[in-house]
Amino acid sequence: MTPENLPIERYDDQLAEKTARLKTLMSPFTAPEPEVFRSPVSHYRMRAEFRIWHDEDEMYHIMFDQQTKQRIRVDKFPAASELINRLMSALIAAIKPEPILRRKLFQIDYLSTRSGKIIASLLYHRKLDDEWQQQAEKLRDDLRAQGFDLQLIGRASKMKIMLDQDYVDEVLPVAGRDMIYRQVENSFTQPNAALNIQMLEWALDVTTGSKGDLLELYCGNGNFSLALARNFERVLATEIAKPSVAAAQYNIAANQIDNVQIIRMAAEDFTQAMNGVREFNRLKGIDLSSYNCETIFVDPPRSGLDDETVKMVQAYPRILYISCNPETLCANLETLQQTHSISRLALFDQFPYTHHMECGVLLEKRV
């Protein structure tokens, strides 16, 4: 596979290989058959990052081969959304003749939405000045005149210049309801929108008929907690990154949801608060004891859950665990299976043609 050529004819084979690998990993835990969710075979990534290569008068996007570290020119990128592909060529063509915009530009990051909005972040190895901003505003206006609903951002060491705003608002149809999600530049968002919708709908399905409240750790911009709010009386969610918390608060208001409370703190600190180990100022006014959380939702980083958090989640009757790394999920399951059994298992092909797997498990307390 090269960046410009996806092995589309191998899509079914690679998905079957992942399914078999997941079954093998899950075999010690008497898991049910995985529910398998397919990705679009191309144009599935809503984000992409490219280095920029300068060769005399030429300038183009590049990526590096993961094995050989060789430089690969990328003029089209079928893994990314069609909108990203269109902007890639238009942006390079517009920047190339402009020395002020070209000089020491080393990377471009793209973030697009299904709703037709896109952010391009231009990263430089130099300080950006008023002259750069004037040229960037002209560039933005020219590209908007070509039909791009574009936000343009300049970045350099300890510098960030927003010409307008640093976010786009995405709209995802989730189980019959349009959900609005503010996505902030340089913050985590799910890269594969089609699979994100399927993950949200699967999470809704497995929590249908839930009793009590939901606790979520690592909630990001509220991706799961807002979609799941309709299945629970109340949702209490934690997130450490400030921009993500701000986006989550906006998303709560935009979706007119009144039963979600977001707390800005690390999952490890929240574990201490729940266990009564110590008190935190940012929890003032929130009565944790008033929540009746029968279900806990976790979507941890690749490293999985730390030992203390694993112990904490074992106290809940139901655990919904979304994992971007089945190996660390299995390490956590070694402990979780002592108290819980897996009732649902899903494979989400977020990253086709790579070894990466996203999966979900619903664990229910053993009687």
From Swiss-Prot:
GO MF, one example: tRNA binding
Enzyme category, top tier: transferase
Presence of keyword Transferase: yes
Record field: catalytic activity: uridine(54) in tRNA + S-adenosyl-L-methionine = 5-methyluridine(54) in tRNA + S-adenosyl-L-homocysteine + H(+); uridine(341) in tmRNA + S-adenosyl-L-methionine = 5-methyluridine(341) in tmRNA + S-adenosyl-L-homocysteine + H(+)
GO cellular component: cytosol
EC id: 2.1.1.-, 2.1.1.35
GO biological process terms held by the UniProt record: tRNA methylation
Coiled-coil residues: none
Binding site for S-adenosyl-L-methionine: Q190, Y218, N223, E239, D299
Keywords: Methyltransferase, S-adenosyl-L-methionine, Transferase, tRNA processing
UniProt-annotated catalytic positions: C324 (nucleophile), E358 (proton acceptor)
Superkingdom classification of source: Bacteria
Family statement drawn from the similarity comment of this UniProt entry: Belongs to the class I-like SAM-binding methyltransferase superfamily. RNA M5U methyltransferase family. TrmA subfamily.
Described function: Dual-specificity methyltransferase that catalyzes the formation of 5-methyluridine at position 54 (m5U54) in all tRNAs, and that of position 341 (m5U341) in tmRNA (transfer-mRNA).
Name used for this protein in its record: tRNA/tmRNA (uracil-C(5))-methyltransferase
Native source organism of the sequence: Serratia proteamaculans (strain 568)
Gene name tied to this protein: trmA
